[in-house]
Amino acid sequence: MLKIADTTFTSRLFTGTGKFATPTLMAEAIKASGSQLVTMAMKRVDLKNGNDDLIAPLKSLGIKLLPNTSGAKTAQEAVFAARLAKEAFDTHWIKLEIHPDTKYLLPDPIETLKAAELLVKEGFVVLPYCSADPVLCRRLEEVGCAAVMPLGSPIGSNQGLQTRDFLRIIIEQTSIPVVVDAGIGAPSHALEALELGADAVLVNTAIAVAKNPVLMAQAFKAAIDAGELARQSGLAVPTSITHMQAQASSPLTQYLEAF
């Protein structure tokens, strides 16, 4: 079980809604993933006419919708988008994204911290997308964020956990859930994140652009389940080769003495 703010999740796989060929395929893949939390950019929502073709299938699955502020370049823009999301979706949950860099979509740490503090004071449950910066994540926790979402590698890069050393520190030092977001390109990346100690991962591109998104969603679900089981069972601690003394798992001593 994973608890964030006032909600408990049985799935540690969060998903996105972008890049799918059709809304129907999106809904089928998300259902196959077992995800219970799905993020959607406010910039994709038609506030006048609604987005029933996108939102209705998600509601029918009973999935919690997490609007995000993707596209915001400043704290002011992000706060405005969050308020619109609260009105449009009747939710106080928000994924905070501020990335003025339109090429690499890297998060702005200063504006993110500023917006997070403002939104928490307004009663939002804030989940900020941020760089894998242990100091920043501590600051985000201190201002009241419900979780932190550090990147594994740049959005859409599918490069996996390029920031794993920093993620380890974040996981060790923070007492709120850590959700690895961005760069998860294969089920093995998601499994690694859970083995590191992350509480969940958010995956979009790797599922949406797969040749078979539904099958890929199932693969990610299996990877997340395996990662969680591995962590619960107690992983063997790696030993430096320079300090290692090999030990046979099936010694032959007693067998040979029998002869």
From Swiss-Prot:
It is found in: Cytoplasm. Keywords: Cytoplasm, Schiff base, Thiamine biosynthesis, Transferase. Pathway: Cofactor biosynthesis; thiamine diphosphate biosynthesis. GO terms for molecular function: thiazole synthase activity. Its main location: cytoplasm. Gene3D superfamilies: Aldolase class I. The keyword Oxidoreductase does not apply. It is an enzyme of class 2 (transferase). Its EC number is 2.8.1.10. One of its GO terms (cellular component) is cytoplasm. 1-deoxy-D-xylulose 5-phosphate binds at residues 156, 182-183, 204-205. PANTHER family: THIAZOLE SYNTHASE. Belongs to the ThiG family. Homotetramer. Forms heterodimers with either ThiH or ThiS. This is Thiazole synthase. It comes from Proteus mirabilis (strain HI4320). The lineage of its organism: Bacteria, Pseudomonadati, Pseudomonadota, Gammaproteobacteria, Enterobacterales. The gene is thiG.
